[in-house]
């Protein structure tokens, strides 16, 4: 006689930003404090899967894996043996957040690609991120100046914006991330181009409450909303009504 387990539910949190995101956060650049807080909270809340999120890069995910999870001495200096054992059972995925060129009520749509942790960091960077282009700050009437989506290019873009528009504050990277936009068609084409590396190893997620819910089904952007509902594999939602729907 065989016993088959029925449906099993786990808590997932796939949208956790790191200090590398360039956002204001309570940790600043104190990565030890961030990692301590992250995993103690995840363990306390019995979360099984997390998505380590950054804008346009996987720098935070890479740092977490190389400087902490792969560093036994560092982990032992921060956590108890029981905590380390619990951390090893947590699935950790890289989540890249893009700001798209599509505008909804004055705001850009955010678009997430969450990769399997089986995909090598080098493949995500070299065969995906660094093949994406964004429009770099240029001069009026010039041909659009495009740059590869690399951290130094984002920083240069942010620095140029700050020099021209004094109201932009924050680091060069923060301003670059705030103003850089991506065409989602590029993302789709590049992922399709490298099917041998990525097929079946990523999902598309969109924060429906922040973005898509602002688009009226009865307005001129009806097809925009419909398109993103069709391409998304999952939605981020905190609104009770959205979840029930």
Residue ranges and their predicted role:
Residues 57, 85-92, 97:
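Extended, helix-rich scaffolding/adaptor regions
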Residues 17, 54-60, 97, 209, ...:
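An acidic- and aromatic-residue-enriched active-site/binding cleft used to recognize and process polar
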């Amino acid at each position: 006689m065989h016993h088959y387990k029925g449906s099993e539910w786990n808590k997932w949190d796939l949208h956790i930003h790191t200090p590398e995101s360039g956002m204001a956060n309570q940790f600043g650049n104190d990565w030890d404090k961030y990692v301590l807080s992250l995993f103690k909270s995840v363990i306390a809340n019995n979360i099984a899967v997390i998505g380590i999120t950054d804008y346009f890069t996987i720098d935070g995910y890479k740092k977490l894996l190389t400087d902490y999870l792969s560093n036994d001495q560092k982990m032992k200096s921060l956590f108890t043996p029981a905590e380390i054992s619990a951390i090893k059972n947590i699935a950790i995925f890289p989540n890249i957040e893009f700001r798209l060129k599509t505008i909804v009520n004055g705001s850009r749509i955010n678009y997430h690609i969450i990769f399997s942790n089986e995909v090598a960091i080098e493949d995500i960077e070299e065969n995906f991120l660094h093949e994406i282009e964004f429009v770099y700050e240029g001069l009026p009437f010039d041909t659009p100046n495009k740059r590869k989506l690399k951290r130094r290019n984002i920083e240069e873009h942010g620095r140029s914006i700050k020099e021209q528009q004094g109201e932009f504050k924050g680091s060069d990277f923060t301003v670059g991330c705030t103003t850089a936009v991506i065409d989602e068609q590029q993302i789709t084409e590049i992922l399709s181009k490298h099917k041998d590396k990525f097929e079946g190893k990523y999902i598309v997620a969109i924060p429906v409450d922040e973005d898509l819910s602002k688009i009226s089904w009865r307005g001129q952007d009806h097809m925009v909303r419909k398109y993103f509902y069709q391409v998304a594999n999952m939605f981020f939602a905190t609104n009770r009504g959205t979840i029930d729907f």
